Every structure is written in C-alpha cells, then in structure tokens.
Amino acid sequence: MALIVQKFGGTSVGSVERIEQVADKVKRFRDAGDDLVVVLSAMSGETNRLIDLAKAISGDQQPLPRELDVIVSTGEQVTIALLAMALNKRGVPAVSYTGSQVRILTDSAHTKARILQIDDQKIRADLKAGRVVVVAGFQGVDEQGNITTLGRGGSDTTGVALAAALKADECQIYTDVDGVYTTDPRVVSVAQRLDKITFEEMLEMASLGSKVLQIRAVEFAGKYNVPLRVLHSFKEGPGTLITIDEEESMEQPIISGIAFNRDEAKLTIRGVPDTPGVAFKILGPISGANIEVDMIVQNVSHDNTTDFTFTVHRNEYDAAERILQNTAKEIGAREVIGDTKIAKVSIVGVGMRSHAGVASRMFEALAKESINIQMISTSEIKVSVVIEEKYLELAVRALHTAFELDAPARQGE
C-alpha cells in the first residue's frame, strides 16, 4: 500500500464527464489498496472567467488583491465537491477540503502567496479512516485567516507541498500529455517520451519554456526530494518519473531534451560610455519595473564605448524599451534598437558534466543549417542560444537529430 498524491489540472476536470473519468481512475487506485490525496484545479477557463468578473466590477481600477483571491478561489471549490460526490457515488468514501480547511498556511502576498507550512493532522485522520481526501489546489490561508492564492500553476505546487508534508511515496501530476518528451512532439514528430529525468534537468526545461510542469513545483519537489511522475489524465502508461538520481548508463544520451521559447525579445543600447557601474545604470531601472532580464551580452569596449544587449519576455518589451530610451538619454548612449522576432533554443542534460565538446556540437549542427547565433548563455547542464524566430523549428529538429534523440523508426516505416 502506497500513499499517493494525485493532481489533476483544469482540462482534466473541465466537465462533469471528465470529472467522472477522474473518479474512475481514483477508484482504481483505491481498489488497489493505495491511500490517496487528490488535488484539483478549477475547470479549464474558470479562473479566467472569475478574473474577468472582478475586472468588470472594478472598472478603471485594478481588482483589490485580497478580494480577487476570495473570488478566484471558488473555482476549485466546485471541482473538489463534484469529485467527492462522484467518488462517494462509486462507493469510495471521500471528503473535500479547501486550502484553508486543511490549513495550508501561506504568507500574505495576495495572488502570489508562498506556502509556509501545512497542518497534516486532518488529512492523516481522514486517510486513517479510509477516506480519499480531495483538496483544492492553488490556494491557502494566511495567519490572519485571509484566503490567499499561489499564482498561476499553483495547483502543481499544492500537490507537491502536500506530498512533502505527508511524506508521500509519489506525487503524480496528470496532464494532457503522457510524460516529459525530449522536445515538443508538435515540432519534432520523432521526439521520445523520457522514462526518467532529474529534478535539475526538469527545472532547466521548465524555466526554458517547457509547459509540462511549473517551475515552483519542480523547485519544491527537488528541495524536499518528492518523487514526481507526469502522466496522461485519460491514457494508461508509465509516464515520466522525475527524481534526484542521476543514473549513468552506456546508452544514456548526453542531452535529455531540447527546450525552446518563442516569447523572447532583444534590446540593445549602443554607444554606451564604458565607465564603472554602467551595467547597473542600464539594468537597475529595468529591475525596478519588475521586468525580468534573461540573457545579457556586453561587447568589448571600442573608443571608450560599448554595446549592451539583453533579452526580456516579449510581453514586457514595450515597457523595457521605454525605460531604456530614457536611460540612453541619461547616460549619453547613441541609440536603442530592438528585435521582437527572435527565439531561444536550449539543450539540457546532466551528461554535459562529463562530456566535452557539447557546445561545439550544438554550434556545428546550427551552422550546417546556416542558422546564425546572436547570443549564447551556458550553465553546468545547459547551453542556450538566441536565433531568428523563423529558424526556430529548423533549429530544434537539427539539434534533436544531432544529439541522437530521434525515436527509432518502427519496422515497416
């Protein structure tokens, strides 16, 4: 008998019919003797609908964060109650709880709260009594009793946090894909599902644009060593196990995956006086506006001036460009130029630690396709490059083949 935390996302509980299917799956695990805690998101689209209501009533003002948390937290209350009803109908004793009812204690940062502590006594009592415990994801309560929410993707974090608190054998994340792939199968048809991947690799892939798991959930799982498994909600299969182990084998590829992100934009401030502290003068106002900077390149000084280039999320390009124009005037830079038609492609793998020449192999594969590299960033298990967006899919396919990640052709194909 295992203690398993299962998390189902919005598409998995997007209708009564789908909730019935989730109930059937949960019952199969319960019949096999497992103790279960099930974490649910709101129905697909429901959180956005509730936010739109809050915006409509607030008019020209931003919705009050505390009240916004109160309204959006109701989405999960619907799904947890419906699933508990569906399970009881099937003869499986089940009870539903909101985040506040099971004392998922958070800080008071409304709409983006962080989990501080979980009181697991109520859940353990229900499990001991033979009940399936269904918990609302995405939400908690602060020390003053205010409802809080964890931000987008918070249900994944709820699931992992509960698994850590309960010392569960596994946390299963159910999605609309059957695991973590070497890259997006919609771009590379011969991409392969990974049986296993490390937390470190998954964290890099999540931060680089992979949408399978939220970064915070992977960080939490890695910190508390919670085994994670990504599975398809309605298809049977082993999924992908995410653990701390780095298993070496003769057949293990150097690279585990190719990640990419289309939502990048690049800004360059040219003719910057090459003086101490110039990087702070450029990036300080950007940081002050809560704009996240990704990759940074500063050219070698020429005639006591330099060019400074960095990337931001495309949604923040306009705001960053306005700030940079003001900075250019203040520091006496020559001009600001931008580019929103770029993309980032990255190779990720713990095998890079023990193999030399990985970056050059990447650059060679791109050169063979006449793809120009504009920026480069590296870490111990990652190499990222910025290229023209129009070459993105070609680059991903070329790298996938170059690092021998393509699935072998089936017999007869």
Tell where the protein language model's regions lie, with residue ranges.
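Acidic-aromatic/histidine active-site loop/patch
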Residues: 221
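A conserved regulatory-domain signal marking ACT and ACT-like small-molecule sensing domains
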Residues: 239-413
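Conserved dinucleotide-binding and phosphotransfer motif residues
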Residues: 32, 90, 224, 289, ...
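Conserved beta-strand segments of alpha/beta enzyme cores
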Residues: 93-95, 227, 292, 372
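Nucleotide/pyrophosphate-binding catalytic subdomain
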Residues: 1-218, 299, 311, 386-388, ...
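Internal glycine-rich alpha/beta core junctions
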Residues: 231-233, 237
